[in-house]
């Protein structure tokens, strides 16, 4: 069975994608990854620490796909890690205009 990793770096990621993840689990083995680091550490530190944790998570298991939701700042290094490791990225809900957050 093909495997998908879903990095849920924000609590909203999992809640908004719950139905999609349930549907995907019918045909794929889905693993949800969440960082243990505190997002209050600042954008740069949070991104870096997420990337390190995610890389360590990927070292334990091979994945066929990575499902990346939205365009949050900490997902860029995570997507880069997937690209470096040859894991195809499925990117959803990206492309919204920036302005409210950073």
Give the positions of each predicted feature.
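Active-site and donor-binding regions of nucleotide-sugar-utilizing enzymes
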Residues: 7-10, 14, 39-102
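N-terminal subdomain of nucleotide-sugar transferases
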Residues: 1-36
């Amino acid at each position: 069975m093909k495997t998908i990793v879903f990095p849920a770096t924000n609590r909203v990621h999992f809640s908004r994608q719950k139905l999609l993840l349930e549907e995907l689990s019918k045909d794929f083995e889905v693993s949800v990854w969440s960082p243990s680091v505190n997002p209050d550490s600042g954008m740069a530190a949070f991104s870096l620490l997420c990337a390190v944790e995610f890389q360590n998570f990927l070292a334990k298991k091979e994945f066929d796909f990575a499902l990346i939701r939205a365009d949050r700042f900490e997902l860029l290094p995570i997507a880069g890690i997937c690209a470096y490791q040859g894991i195809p990225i499925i990117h959803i809900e990206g492309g919204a205009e920036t302005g409210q957050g950073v």
